[in-house]
Amino acid sequence: MVVYNTLTRRKEVFQPLAAGGSQSVSVGNSQGSAAPVAEEKPLVRMYVCGVTVYDLCHLGHARTYVVWDMVRRYLEWRGYRVKYVQNFTDVDDKILKRALERGESMQAVAERFIAEYFRDMDCLNIKRADFYPRATQSLQAMFQLIQSLELKGFAYRVRDPIRHQTDQSSLLQAGHQPETPASVQYSVYYSVRKFPDYGQLSGRKLEEMEAGASGRVGEEGAEKQDPFDFALWKAAPPSEPGFASPWGWGRPGWHIECSAMVRETLGDHIDIHAGGADLIFPHHENELAQSEPITGKPMAKYWMHNGFLNINGEKMSKSLGNFTTLRQALAVYHPMALRLFLLQTHYRSPIDLTEAAMQAASRGWETLQKGIHCAQHFCKEEKGSPDAEAMQAFQAAMDNDFGTPEALAIAFELAKELTREHNLFTHQGQTHLEPQALKQKSAALLEILATLGFCWPSFSEFEGSKEAATNGELNFKKIEELIAQRSAARKAKNFSEADRIRDQLKALGITLIDQKDGTTRWLRE
């Protein structure tokens, strides 16, 4: 199995740190998970940079987290035990701006959009991380890292004579004025020229870089020793949200947050550090530079990055104003059609979002759904072991740096073949393939799609939805009644009942889309 390492700019044999020199992977079994060679599954420690929680997720976010969900699932299928960590950046100038616009605290804004994040990702069947650390919960780890960098000569202070907050525990809310005397406090910067390997991840040289590119914290070039230095800690006015620190009142720099959270949750040396290609520089470059002088170890063995999702040739981003929220897309397209669209292109290549491409993905998902139903029909009494030839081809595709386009091509061939066989059986009462071969191909299709993170109703649910629709039971009035019951359950905080109703409707081919104003839209799948 090989993966592309951004650090070395080549594909490398995947060998996790915990595996040593032993063989540690094997072919998946019929239950969708791989049987490891060793009794103890080799551990893969994987960190993915998460969202800054000030707005709804856009389709660029969807691509990132579908990709790394796919990678995680495949590693688990191959027999690894993945410890998957993904952070939330819950202190940031963008969150502060949104909080001031709405007259809320940064914490309230962050909490709301964390909840919205989970709603969106659940629609795409993205597995929950093992840990979701937050920047505001890792302050002590940040302080320790910054102090260590100061002691080793990699960081320096810049005096900032503004009032500071001395309370070591409270988060200052926007507009609150602490009654403390004026004092001196500091910003702390990382000196990039002290780290000889700076630029190794991005392949850039200092003289070619753009000064101030880390601009998450509004750095003023005049106060830095070098224009390329970046903030570890930035002093803040007492009227702004912030934290008490060894350097006075302020907020952490963007990059130190992830370094601290990686170290707290996974240790000094991890297997995979992943994120979007836009994070290679400056974020991941700076993470590496500020972590390795402290630990004396490479921060990650494999640095992995997914390509952009483009609109009209430009990366989708909020800063460019060309983004479509995931919520908007889910109001039009089936979640699994969207997942299919995002995985039909290799994860390192850019994707161009067009209406034609999404319509093609929707038709593709319909093809796969037909194949799934046929596979469920052939396997309804007894599930066979998956077809060996198909599974070997799937593994060969995925072992080559997670080749999902080739893997999905195998799934489409199986789906079409099973649909042909099912149609033949329906009209003529016979099939070309023997029953055992049909079961094996059916099991292969279901296992491949499950490993790639697709989900679908069970056979009984599928048949039940068809029968209900035929009998006229799934009419507009019934749908609206169930939605009203679900809304009442949510208001009563009976979330298990609300989820049961949502799942009941989903099994009947109805997708619910909760709106910002509290109403709920529904779509037939």
Swiss-Prot record:
Question: Which family is it part of?
Answer: Belongs to the class-I aminoacyl-tRNA synthetase family.
Cysteine pairs bridged by disulfides in the record: none
Its EC top class is ligase
Q: Which UniProt keywords apply?
A: Aminoacyl-tRNA synthetase, ATP-binding, Cytoplasm, Ligase, Metal-binding, Nucleotide-binding, Protein biosynthesis, Zinc
The principal localisation class reads cytoplasm
Q: Where in the cell is it found?
A: Cytoplasm
The cofactor(s) it depends on are: Zn(2+)
Task: Summarize subunit and interaction data from the UniProt record for this chain.
Answer: Monomer.
Q: What is the lineage of its organism?
A: Bacteria, Bacillati, Cyanobacteriota, Cyanophyceae, Synechococcales
Gene name of the encoded protein: cysS
One GO MF annotation is: ATP binding
- Tell me a GO cellular component: cytosol
Q: Which GO terms describe its biological process?
A: cysteinyl-tRNA aminoacylation
Which residue numbers does the motif 'KMSKS' region cover?
315-319
Keyword check for Membrane, yes or no: no
Its recorded reaction(s) are: tRNA(Cys) + L-cysteine + ATP = L-cysteinyl-tRNA(Cys) + AMP + diphosphate
Pfam families documented for this protein: CysS_C, DALR_2, tRNA-synt_1e
- PANTHER family (UniProt xref): CYSTEINE--TRNA LIGASE, CYTOPLASMIC, CYSTEINYL-TRNA SYNTHETASE
- Motif annotated as 'HIGH' region, chain positions: 51-61
Q: Which InterPro entries match?
A: Cys-tRNA-ligase, Cys-tRNA-synt_Ia_DALR, Cys-tRNA/MSH_ligase, CysS_C, Rossmann-like_a/b/a_fold, tRNA-synt_1_cat_dom, tRNAsynth_Ia_anticodon-bd
| SMART domains linked to this entry | DALR_2
Q: What is this protein called?
A: Cysteine--tRNA ligase
Q: Which organism is it from?
A: Synechococcus sp. (strain JA-2-3B'a(2-13))
What EC number is given for this enzyme? 6.1.1.16
